[in-house]
Amino acid sequence: MKKNRLLALFLALTLMLSLAACGNSSAPAASNQETGSTAAASGDAGDDTADNPYANPYANPEEGGDNPYANPYANPGEGGDNPYGNPYANPGEGGEAQEAPAVELFGAEKYVPTPGDGAKYTVTETPDGWIEIANEGGETLGLSPISGVKVVEADGFAFKDLNQNGELDPYEDWRLDSAERTKDLIAQMEGVEKATILLHSNNLADAYSTEPVTTQDVTYTVLMGGARGGVTRNGLRGRDHAVWANNAQAVAESAWYGIPVMISIDPSFISGMVESVSLASTMDPELAAEIGKETAREYRSIGVTAFLGPQVDIASPTQDRAGGTYGEDPQLTLDLATAYVNAMQSTYDESGKDLGWGEDSVYCFTKHFAGAGATEGGRNDHSPTGRYAVFPGDNLEAHLITYFDGVFNLPGKTGTSGIMTEYAIDVDGEGVPYGGEWAGAYNPYLNGMLDEFGFDGLKITDWGVFEFAGVWGAEDLPQPERVALGWERGVNLLGGFDDTQVIADAYALLVERNGQEKADEIIDKAASKFIEVMMDLNMFDQPYVDTAETAKLVGSDESAAYGLETQRESVVMIKNDGTISKDGAKADKPKVYVPYVYNTGFSVSWMGGINPGKGSWSPSMDIDALSKYFDVITDTVNDPTGDPDEEGNATYTPDDITRAAKEDIASCDYVLVGMTNPYSVSYDDNYVVAWIYQMSYDNGLFFEDTTWYPASLQYGAYKADTARETSISGMILPDGTRQNRSYKGVTAPEAPNYGDLEALQYATEAAGDVPVIVSMSMERGMVWSEVEPLADVILVNYNNQKPDVVAEIILGKTEPNGLLVFQQPKDMEEVEKQLEDVPRDMECYKDSEGNVYDFAFGLNWSGKINDDRVKTYSKDPIDTVKGFDYKAYEAANK
């Protein structure tokens, strides 16, 4: 049986190699030229750009450096060895792929099962093309008519013959529990096969086409290579994505024992529902559960079965990735994450009863384990500047609470979530690493903690940890040794990794270092958990989705209305001098002035490095959306007069604007200025982008006379006179000393969006007696002394502007209900005094009305909110894990 399977696999994989030899002839191009193995920006790639963590960082690829998602094998011979060569030429060993005659994988005629006499099932051809097989009182199956998989009968019931041997194997028997089915499948597989399915590809598709998958497609290449997981970058396409997912599952069903593909997704704000900090501002775990349940339904409807989140890092004030978290408070993060994950992972009947795992369940990889919110200077840990998370307050335990007391001990029937490892190396206040100089995927201290606890969920690495990001500590190891070490330390799935040849070599190395029995124990544990999760998700029996239902659910008027309702709960009012109230505006359609704002385009990111950018003008809020509620006047953008860009086109300068006349502004009912919180990331002037880090390391990474720049939470330039003289963290230099990353005395320039403040200053000056309303889009705290004195009303929109809700609040139709999830510091000196690992330890800004902008502060029509949420979450931050004796573990292992 195994020999036959391996031969079939050998032939199928070799199809790709033989097609490559055809070049530009009439035969299709080789599918292995459509993708590559070195891909990988963040597994949370949706949540990590300098300005908008959910924006596409490759919208302007020429500005962001090389695209890590590009195919390095598009020009054979230039990109290194092909990672999709056949690793099974010598099962259990590494080595080169061998050639064999090509075969046609999808040559079989369309298959539709015909129930025999006494059959207890019915067969329906769906409009989507897959076959639905409904067993009486049993499982409903989904089957592709072109995958080669047929039906076998037993006791009158239908079962999918996933390994195509004409028999009913236990793993194909839906009457058995997931553990028993998993055990049978694992017993049928070779060691290197089990290792290969642990690949979680960064590149499951190139165009997410709605056309059937061909042998030229990336989807075919990756899945026929053996990967059985991968992230989608296109989940918002709704029905089109569902069609692609169905086609991908048909390919997966055709080979590799019919194992389905786990399609994962980053946070995506699907249907406009609030997530991360915008969900946190509601401080409502019940709403988090509702959103988790609805999000899971929508994800499953597009074919997604795993969520790369939620991000439960306890964020420091300057953390670059703060916008993807639930804020800075451990109790709030614990409550929201537990409710959200519990609801996402469970399936519910019509009465709301928790059924545990089922057809509506989405598996969660809670991230980033653990402590990633405490990076020094807030630096992004994808890049070597953010290599370390620091714990000067000896408070790592507070960053573990959400895991051990929450998502590892869910109140529902699914028990526990999975986890994603962090990139950073955790160090104490003296700069001494927890578990040695190892990033999260390799770290024995963090992985050992999970083992000591008895964690039985899936562990996936963050993206790129075997190649460029989070490879910290393993730089001198070849890739197969990195992968083998990761498995030895306890990780299961390899996030963003595609290279089957490296996997074959890593498995051989695992056997060499540990012996066959121990190597199989390591791989079997990882593969078994992965298979069992997909069994629990009902993926083996029914991996297909009804795209008509997708269209009804995703992007529908009903789902959009629900998304808007969640947004209404999230907006925070922190100042109101009486300008707005429940009584509404005096006019039916008030007249408002909305200015344009200038942005220099400067950015520093782990993807694009130091990018001077180019200037741009844009309306400070969505004028089309606001025009439904207001008579809007605005500015006029003139032709650009700045220096030409690389294409010879003039660029915009701060002077290329004609502001609305002051007399027109004075005739308005309101001035409404949309702003984005100021944020300047901490970086050094020899900044190394993530995917050239290894090359830089190999060539001698360390530079003399490096200047480090401070993070800043204000619009104006900031000189860090009170910063640490010596940084806590730093790489060990060739002479054995530690690099000093201090930025004391260095000045951060004006924020790239300093134009927001200039627009407010002009509007305030021109307004006269016209009330000025600021709508601030935020992802963290900020210094308000530049803004607050100029505004009569301030509304905070976490993650992004919500123009409909802002308009409703101004018109008195919606009462603000949100609360601040970050302290707003009095000044930057408070930020410098703050200990990165200690929540809520700053003196906060007090405004002209006497209100202090502290955590859990917010106003409604009656004034300062003081409800049960405020009473619950205003208590002193918790710092002790209840479900795990961390102090004992630390004493024994640090």
Model-predicted segments: where are they?
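Bacterial N-terminal signal peptides that target proteins for export
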Residues: 1-10
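C-terminal motif of bacterial Sec signal peptides marking the signal peptidase cleavage site
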Residues: 17-21
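Bacterial signal peptide processing site
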Residues: 23-25
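Glycoside hydrolase catalytic-domain context in secreted enzymes
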Residues: 29, 33, 39-43, 55-894
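G/A/S/T/P/Q/N-biased, glycine-rich low-complexity segments that form flexible N-terminal tails, linkers
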Residues: 45-50
